[in-house]
Amino acid sequence: VGMIVLNDAYGTGLATNIRSSVESAGGQIIAEEMFNEGDSQFSSQVDAVAATDPDAIVVISFQQATSIVPLLTAKGIDPAQLFFVDGNTSDYSGDLDPGTLEGAQGTIPGPFASDNFKESLLEIDPALKDWSYAGESYDAVTMTALAAEAAGSTEGTAIAAELQGVSADGEKCFDYAGCVTILREGGDID
């Protein structure tokens, strides 16, 4: 596996974890080339990684992917060999030719946003296009509201004191209304 990595805490942190995962699965990182924020030329990194003929290439970047990917494909790298991270899994239809990323894969943090969940969010904000952290944000707001209900207060310290209590060792509930009902009936929720 080859890697082209943004040289900052985000990029190097991901690279360390990817290296660990690849190696623990029996793979090997055969090339790792860094670039700095603000760089606009990536030919040397692409040339160095492509020269090792890796089975896969991980691109740890943000918008720089729009410059890096065409250089990789011009070197004969099949898009199916490309792997992206949350920072560069975006809609590149306005930046790259159709088919440029066909077969490429990427990761996005958090749970998969179901169509029903997306539809619910679009009812609130029809312009929403990015679902990154949507599930976590929804859960955080819901947990905070439930903790406020359990505390009977909107004071930050009171809410904080109840967060663990509304998320462990109680009756399972799966929506806000159901959880609030249990709390208001004197029950304990999880």
Predicted regions and their residues:
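Extracytosolic ligand-binding ectodomains
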Residues: V1-D190
